């Protein structure tokens, strides 16, 4: 499949299922599968093939078990997993730098971890992190060439792991540092829907379970070429929980994904992508990520994402139902809120020769501002001041 445009790749839709070749089933001896009372599926060694929603919430969402296998820290050794992979922290010198949490407070990247056992952490490193770390060193061209040959599943799972870890971490972080405002955690304050994370958790564990993933179980996924600009920024990460969307930039390559749209929000975003004729800036990248989230929350219907089992054959597959890609009436006030949140650390830094900082922020809140196109609808290719 050819890229949608020379600087972007778009996920294809086709038959499945597909799996990540190297899985935790490195010992390929078949194991008898059974279903537990809570609806989970386990093999005869007790390994969890599928976490029921009840078990996921109890052990992973609200518990302290390994987020991959569900083992308790009282039973096996843990060394925990960095939310942002350690090789990214090393490559971009982020260990002693801080990220901004949804509550506006900061946390150092090297302390931003989630519970993970030693075995699963090692497996994830071998199967996911090390290959993708090596691949991304080659930048956009190498990543795009690899995707053309191998497809998107490995990259999609990797980005999904980042999103999952980020929001599992939110269940442990206080929403308010001022105790007078209560002791709720960020996940409680923002009313996280564990069902959404449960589906993603099931999918991204495929490297450890051998689960087959049909392409209709995947959402929108884009690889974007990013140009260097005056900001000097080479790493960027952000996500929007309720729209199940995420963006990650590593040098000149960036990834944008939406996990629950069945690819339909991406179909509408393609109308803008077709007008982009070069690499994007860091600001334009954030707008694209926001636009994907905005379109996703305006889809008329979302696919049902489900697991299918054959316990006798020890097979687990994930599929998504087909829904017609349709949008409800677009509410640009929602776009304004999303844009304001995504750009909250950039106000005062992005300049326009026509408006003051305050006027431009007001335009962003209004939901109609764009960094992608000029007044004539042409793509803005350089770092000239915004019109």
Residue map of PLM features:
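C-terminal, charged low-complexity interaction regions
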Residues: 7-8, 18-20, 28, 183-387
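Intrinsically disordered, low-complexity boundary segments flanking structured domains
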Residues: 65-70, 144-145, 242-244
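Internal, well-ordered alpha/beta segment that forms a basic, Gly-enriched binding/recognition surface
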Residues: 97, 103-188
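Structured loops at beta-to-helix junctions and adjacent beta-edge loops in soluble globular domains
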Residues: 69-72, 118-120, 158-167, 249-251, ...
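An N-terminal structural lobe/cap that precedes and organizes the functional/catalytic core
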Residues: 5, 10-20, 25-140
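Generic signature of intrinsically disordered, low-complexity, basic-rich segments
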Residues: 17-21, 64, 147, 156, ...
């Amino acid at each position: 499949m050819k890229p949608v445009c020379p600087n972007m790749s778009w996920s294809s839709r086709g038959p499945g299922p597909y799996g990540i070749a190297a899985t935790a089933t490195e010992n390929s001896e078949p194991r008898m599968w059974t279903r537990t009372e809570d609806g989970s599926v386990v093999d005869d060694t007790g390994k969890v093939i599928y976490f029921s929603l009840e078990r996921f919430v109890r052990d992973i969402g609200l518990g302290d078990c390994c987020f991959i296998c569900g083992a308790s820290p009282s039973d096996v050794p843990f060394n925990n997993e960095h939310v942002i992979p350690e090789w990214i922290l090393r490559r971009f010198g982020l260990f002693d730098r801080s990220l901004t949490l949804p509550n506006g407070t900061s946390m150092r990247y090297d302390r931003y971890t989630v519970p993970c056992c030693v075995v699963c952490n090692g497996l994830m490193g071998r199967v996911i992190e090390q290959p993708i770390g090596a691949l991304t060193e080659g930048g956009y061209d190498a990543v795009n060439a690899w995707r053309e040959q191998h497809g998107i599943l490995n990259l999609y799972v990797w980005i999904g792991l980042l999103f999952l870890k980020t929001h599992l971490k939110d269940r442990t972080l206080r929403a308010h540092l001022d105790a007078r405002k209560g002791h709720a955690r960020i996940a409680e304050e923002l009313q996280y829907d564990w069902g959404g994370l449960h589906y993603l958790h099931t999918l991204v564990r495929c490297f450890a379970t051998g689960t087959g993933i049909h392409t209709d179980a995947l959402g929108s996924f884009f690889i974007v070429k990013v140009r260097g600009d005056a900001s000097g920024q080479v790493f960027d990460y952000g996500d929007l929980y309720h729209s199940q969307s995420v963006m990650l930039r590593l040098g000149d390559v960036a990834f944008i994904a939406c996990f629950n749209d069945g690819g339909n929000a991406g179909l509408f975003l393609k109308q803008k992508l077709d007008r982009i004729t070069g690499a994007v800036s860091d600001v334009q990248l954030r707008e694209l990520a926001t636009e994907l989230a905005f379109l996703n929350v305006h889809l008329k219907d979302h696919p049902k994402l489900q697991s299918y089992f054959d316990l006798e054959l020890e097979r687990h597959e994930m599929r998504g139902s087909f829904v017609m890609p349709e949008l409800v009436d677009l509410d640009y006030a929602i776009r304004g809120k999303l844009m304001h949140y995504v750009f909250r650390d950039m106000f005062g830094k992005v300049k326009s020769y026509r408006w003051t900082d305050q006027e431009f922020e007001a335009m962003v809140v209004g939901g109609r501002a764009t960094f992608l196109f000029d007044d004539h609808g042409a793509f803005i290719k350089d770092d000239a001041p915004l019109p």
